[in-house]
Design a protein with these regions (language model features):
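Membrane-interface helix-boundary motifs at transmembrane edges
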Residues: 16-22, 73-83, 139-148
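Alpha-helical transmembrane segments with an aromatic anchor "belt"
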Residues: 49-108, 121
Length: 170
């Protein structure tokens, strides 16, 4: 539990993921939670079968993107730390996204004005926060400049969300 709390503190830009050494069981639980929470969120947005396919594609793209980056910068030994840090923080953001969808449903059912605008604004806030978190993790673990880590985080977001979404639209 203490390791989870340390990883979650990365969402508030504290700690360094290089200091954490997750066990294989912890990493697998992180991946399973990532998949289940993704299936729930995508299942609420779209057809459940499409959601499962899209989340599976996102996971594949995430693992491949992290691996490619670490091979490129010759830091393969950081793979477990990097993917665990990103996935834990992404799980946190995904949990907040699920709560946002519940809030949106409640606002629609109670006929609240601007329900759609509010949920879209929260969505943009969560995406911005997610990119900032990934940028922080990359900067801490790979000791890169702020501008490089922001570009890498944005690229990671496009690769893990944009490409699977594009594939699903084809």
């Amino acid at each position: 539990m203490s390791l989870l709390i340390k990883y979650l503190s990365l969402c508030w830009f504290r700690n360094n993921p290089a200091d954490f050494h997750p066990s294989h069981a912890f990493m697998w639980k992180t991946v399973i939670f990532y998949l289940i929470s993704g299936f729930i969120v995508e299942g609420l947005i779209a057809d459940p079968a499409d959601g499962i396919l899209e989340v599976s594609l996102r996971a594949i793209m995430a693992f491949a993107s992290i691996g490619t980056l670490l091979l490129f910068v010759k830091r393969w030994e950081c793979y477990n730390q990097l993917f665990t840090a990103i996935f834990i923080c992404e799980n946190f953001i995904m949990t907040l996204a699920t709560i946002t969808e519940g809030l949106y449903f409640w606002m629609v059912m109670t006929h609240k004005e601007n329900a759609e605008e509010i949920s879209i604004a929260i969505g943009f806030l969560l995406v911005g926060w997610y990119i900032a978190i990934v940028s922080y993790i990359l900067r801490q673990l790979l000791v890169s400049q702020m501008s490089h880590s922001v570009i890498l985080a944005f690229s990671y977001f496009i690769l893990t969300y944009g490409i699977p979404m594009l594939f699903m639209d084809i």
